Amino acid sequence: MGQCRSANAEDAQEFSDVERAIETLIKNFHQYSVEGGKETLTPSELRDLVTQQLPHLMPSNCGLEEKIANLGSCNDSKLEFRSFWELIGEAAKSVKLERPVRGH
C-alpha cells in the first residue's frame, strides 16, 4: 500500500468523517502505547484502551477480551497496530445501525 500523508491541523478540515475516525484510532493507539515502543501495546495498555475507549463494545465482543487473554499478562507480549486494527474491525461487526445512513 502507498504512503499516507501526515495529518496536521490545516488538513483536518479536509478530512472526511471516515478519515477523522481513522486518525482518531491511530492517535488513541499511540496515546496508550507508552510502556514499550509507540508501535505496540502491552496487554495492560490494550486492556486500558479497550475499557476506556470502547466501554460499550467490550462487553458484547468476546474477540477483544479473547485477544487480550491470548497476549497473556506478561508485558513482554506486544500487540502491533495491524492486530489492533483487526480488533477494531471485530468490534465494528457488533455495531448495528438503527437505520441505514444514506447520502454519504
From Swiss-Prot:
Tissues expressing this chain: Expressed at highest levels in colon and at moderate levels in thymus, kidney, liver, small intestine, and lung. Low expression in heart and no expression is seen in brain, skeletal muscle, spleen, placenta and peripheral blood leukocytes.
Single GO cellular component term: extracellular exosome
Primary location group: cytoplasm
Disulfide bonds: none
GO molecular function: calcium ion binding; calcium-dependent protein binding; chemokine receptor binding
Localization per record: Cytoplasm
Coiled-coil regions, chain positions: none
Domain spans labelled EF-hand: 27-61
One matching Pfam family: S_100
CDD domains recorded: S-100A13
GO biological process per UniProt: apoptotic process; calcium ion homeostasis; defense response to bacterium; positive regulation of granulocyte chemotaxis; positive regulation of monocyte chemotaxis; response to lipopolysaccharide; toll-like receptor 4 signaling pathway
Keywords: Apoptosis, Cytoplasm
Subunit composition and interactions: Homodimer. Interacts with AGER.
Its job: Modulates P53/TP53 protein levels, and thereby plays a role in the regulation of cell survival and apoptosis. Depending on the context, it can promote cell proliferation or apoptosis. Plays a role in the regulation of cell migration by modulating the levels of MMP2, a matrix protease that is under transcriptional control of P53/TP53. Does not bind calcium.
Name the UniProt record assigns to this protein: Protein S100-A14
Primary gene name: S100A14
